[in-house]
Curated annotation (Swiss-Prot):
It comes from Xenopus tropicalis (Western clawed frog). Residues 43-155 are annotated as: Disordered. Possible splicing regulator involved in the control of cellular survival. This is Protein SREK1IP1. One of its GO terms (biological process) is mRNA processing.
Length: 155
């Protein structure tokens, strides 16, 4: 059978770096790498008393200050580059917008011209003229239908 002392309930998962349960190895914050050339230094501040916390904070701040100075310089350079890129993009974008606006204006003016021409061709017809045209159509259609009926009867 199975060994009585070993099962999933009895095995506690813990950190392989510091040995404390409650977090996994990749989540371990008890080790700090002060210098990349040196070995890993154990940071016991999370497990020690309140008196030693002040000392460990001061030690931790010193390397962090050096990093902050270099980080701020890098950040400033990045910001400058980003601003330049944004300005360049705006210039390109704004010029294309003005082209689009001019094209849109041309289209609108062409549409207006077409409307004006269409109206001029169509012109205004007065009611009397329309009535005359209708009468002429009716008379021409009735005469043509009567002539067609006469021709069919004569056959």
């Amino acid at each position: 059978m199975a060994v009585p002392g070993v099962n999933k309930d009895n095995i506690r998962a813990g950190c392989k770096k510091c040995g404390y349960p409650g977090h996994l190895t990749f989540e371990c914050r008890n080790f700090l790498r002060v210098d990349p050339q040196r070995d890993i230094v154990l940071d016991v501040s999370s497990t020690s008393t309140e008196d030693s916390e002040d000392e460990s904070e001061e030690v931790a701040r010193a390397p962090a200050d050096k990093k902050n100075v270099t980080d701020t310089g890098k950040k400033k350079l990045k910001r400058k580059k980003e601003k330049k890129l944004k300005k360049h993009r705006k210039r390109l974008h704004s010029s294309s917008e003005s082209d689009d606006n001019s094209k849109a204006k041309k289209r609108k003016s062409q549409k207006k011209e077409k409307r004006v021409k269409h109206k001029a061709k169509k012109g205004k017809q007065h009611k009397k003229d329309k009535r005359k045209e209708k009468r002429e159509r009716k008379s021409s259609s009735s005469s043509s239908s009567s002539s067609s009926s006469q021709s069919s009867s004569s056959d």
